[in-house]
């Protein structure tokens, strides 16, 4: 059995880690970075780019570059009006579900997330040198059932068996507390990422990680701070030039990148200059954007966002039934916690300096890897007790939501309650499953509906319908309804209407595999072309250096093979390039044999110039190693 990797599938960046013995290791991607931008793009030629490659071309290809897809996971189209405004790409309504359009093809958010997960999977496989099929994936603690299901589906499409969905603050607490098993402390994990905000209160001790309460806002994160800067820059430029840059997709993408950079700079400086030359043009000529932004101004225009951060904190502390002074540490997680004002708010609210001992960008992936180690049996003496973030219940008479499972109930859990009919001779009931904290059913999130029929006719209130709610370790819900008189039972695993069915997932998995094969083929072609380029360079260098030492009868054939390789490199396929390389190496091998028979000739290596770099020179010794000797030419007259 292979390793279970831990993946932090973030709004802005993603990260992958794995247990190496007893220690978690964050894995660098192919670009040498420990985090990967959560971005996907399709170029005009149809090439699919993920991560840094997608980010690099975002300015010139904004309509076909998708970012912050996590904010659309498991959501209806009418639930994401604000997120839609932040997107440079097209977000469309398909049967009430939010979908994205890339290069005229429609993708579900799960498919796009699967592309990012595939990149993380490949990163882990390259590092481990083996296939990876199992993963623990993190989600915001305040993700609802539909969003958790969507994340699990994305994992399946990417070819991963998702062993556990784990809440991000809980994962961070695991990473923070792994080496503190013997101590007992109460910890608040404050997680402000690119698209979501979570606050969880946990009790750590003797290897037990118990979540006391959790709260948050899945519409609040770094993207929203960026948007405040974007709007400010666009408004200022409109005042100066009379042009709204938000109507120009390329200019808007430049504003987005500049806003993100300015936000980062304001974490270490009190002001920054945003300078975007040639941002647009009119008949009068090119226009440039040069605006100075101070930290004070940034904090003032984001005041409403800072206020929103405090509300979930109040609720989380209240629901934990702990006094503020009982909380020992406040651990900061997520890139947006680097904003000085956020750190000040945390300090003022909790009355203590926040703990900055963990890397906010990597700690969640590390925690996921630890959970993978727990499931695998590599990490022992660790027990994780998480909670359901939102209340769960059904709609009852009068459109009221009757709760069966309260928010912050430890999971896994199972609750039963008996209900009855609302009318005489009623022979069927509809079970309307809800998630949320509002008293009226219509104000909460519908998770699903199902019917229980063939109830024997009886006066109102007589039939006994037993409803059971069952939440598994992933926080995913199953519901059953049973007529106690007949024993007839109806059970469903809650699937939001937007959830992908098995056939759709299998099709998407196949598409993902095909793209993975295409990506591998493309990489192999690039490797061949790089080798050919190196061989051409080495051959030309040796031709110059060896000159007349190359036998006259062999030189034309060598030069002919070189020209053939150049032509194949310029216009040919990978197969034709490889064939031309083989021919050229064969010619070099033949020439090398001749040169070795000439004592004073510096021959190329027996198989020709190295395709990976400089040609080898020198004489081979008896042990097969190249021997380089220093020698001196002595004139006979000096003897």
Swiss-Prot record:
Induction: By stress conditions e.g. heat shock. The keyword Magnesium does not apply. Keywords: ATP-binding, Chaperone, Nucleotide-binding, Phosphoprotein, Stress response. GO terms for molecular function: ATP binding; ATP-dependent protein folding chaperone; unfolded protein binding. PROSITE patterns: HSP70_1, HSP70_2, HSP70_3. InterPro entries: ATPase_NBD (IPR043129), Chaperone_DnaK (IPR012725), Heat_shock_70_CS (IPR018181), HSP70_C_sf (IPR029048), HSP70_peptide-bd_sf (IPR029047), Hsp_70_fam (IPR013126). The keyword Phosphoprotein applies. The modification Phosphothreonine is found at residue 196. Residues 592-639 are annotated as: Disordered. Residues 601-613 have a biased composition (Low complexity). Acts as a chaperone. PANTHER family: HEAT SHOCK PROTEIN 70KDA (PTHR19375). Belongs to the heat shock protein 70 family. This is Chaperone protein DnaK. The lineage of its organism: Bacteria, Pseudomonadati, Chlorobiota, Chlorobiia, Chlorobiales.
């Amino acid at each position: 059995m292979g390793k279970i990797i831990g993946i932090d599938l973030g709004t802005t960046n993603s990260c992958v880690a794995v247990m190496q013995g007893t220690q978690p290791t964050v894995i660098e991607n192919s670009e040498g970075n420990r985090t990967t931008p959560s971005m996907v793009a399709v170029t005009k030629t149809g090439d699919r780019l993920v991560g840094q490659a997608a980010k690099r071309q975002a300015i010139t290809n904004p309509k076909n570059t998708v970012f912050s897809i996590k904010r659309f996971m498991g959501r209806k189209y009418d639930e994401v009006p604000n997120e839609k405004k932040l997107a440079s790409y097209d977000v469309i309504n398909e049967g009430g579900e939010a979908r994205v359009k890339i290069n005229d093809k429609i993708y579900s958010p799960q498919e796009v997330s699967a592309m990012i997960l595939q990149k993380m999977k490949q990163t882990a496989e390259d590092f481990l040198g083996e296939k990876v099929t199992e993963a623990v994936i993190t989600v915001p603690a305040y993700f609802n059932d539909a969003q958790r299901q969507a994340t699990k589906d994305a994992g399946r499409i990417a070819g991963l068996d998702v062993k556990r969905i784990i809440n991000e603050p809980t994962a961070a607490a695991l990473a923070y507390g792994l080496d503190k098993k013997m101590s007992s402390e109460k910890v608040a994990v404050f997680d402000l990422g690119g698209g979501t905000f979570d606050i969880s209160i946990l009790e750590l001790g003797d290897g037990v990680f118990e979540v006391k309460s959790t709260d948050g806002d899945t519409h609040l994160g770094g993207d929203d701070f960026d948007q405040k800067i974007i709007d400010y820059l666009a408004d200022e430029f409109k005042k100066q030039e009379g042009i709204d840059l938000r109507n120009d997709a390329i200019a808007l993408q430049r504003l987005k990148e500049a806003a993100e950079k300015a936000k980062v700079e304001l974490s270490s400086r009190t002001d920054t200059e945003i300078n975007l030359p040639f941002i647009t043009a009119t008949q009068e000529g090119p226009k440039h954007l040069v605006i100075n932004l101070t930290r004070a101004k940034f904090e003032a225009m984001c005041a409403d966002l800072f206020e929103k951060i405090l509300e979930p904190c109040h609720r989380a502390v209240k629901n934990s039934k702990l006094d503020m002074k009982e909380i020992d540490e406040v651990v900061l997680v997520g890139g947006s916690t680097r904003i000085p004002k956020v750190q000040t708010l945390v300090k003022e609210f909790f009355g203590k300096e926040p703990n900055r001992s963990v890397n906010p960008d990597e700690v969640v992936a590390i925690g996921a890897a630890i959970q993978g180690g727990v499931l695998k049996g590599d990490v022992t003496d660790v027990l994780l007790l998480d909670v359901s973030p939102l209340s769960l219940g059904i709609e009852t008479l009068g459109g009221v939501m009757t709760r069966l499972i309260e928010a912050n109930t430890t999971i896994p859990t199972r609750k039963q309650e008996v209900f009855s009919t609302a009318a005489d001779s009623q022979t069927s009931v509809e079970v309307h499953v809800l998630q949320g904290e509002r008293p009226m059913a219509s104000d909460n999130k519908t998770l699903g509906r199902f019917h229980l029929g063939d109830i024997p006719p009886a006066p109102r209130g007589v039939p006994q319908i037993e409803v059971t709610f069952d939440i598994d370790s992933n926080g995913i819900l199953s519901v059953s309804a049973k007529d106690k008189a007949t024993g007839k039972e109806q059970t469903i695993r809650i699937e939001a209407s937007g959830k992908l069915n098995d056939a759709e997932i299998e099709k998407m998995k196949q598409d993902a595999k095909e793209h993975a094969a295409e990506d591998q083929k493309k990489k192999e072609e690039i490797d061949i072309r790089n080798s050919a380029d190196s061989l051409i360079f080495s051959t030309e260098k040796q031709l110059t250096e060896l000159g007349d030492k190359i036998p006259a009868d062999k030189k034309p054939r060598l030069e002919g093979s070189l020209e053939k390789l150049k032509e194949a490199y310029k216009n040919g396929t990978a197969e034709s390039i490889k064939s031309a390389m083989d021919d050229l190496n064969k010619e070099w091998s033949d020439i090398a044999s001749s040169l070795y028979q000439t004592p004073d000739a510096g021959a190329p290596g027996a198989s020709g110039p190295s395709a990976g770099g400089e040609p080898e020179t020198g004489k081979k010794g008896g042990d097969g190693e190249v021997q380089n000797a220093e020698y001196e030419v002595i004139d006979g007259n000096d003897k």
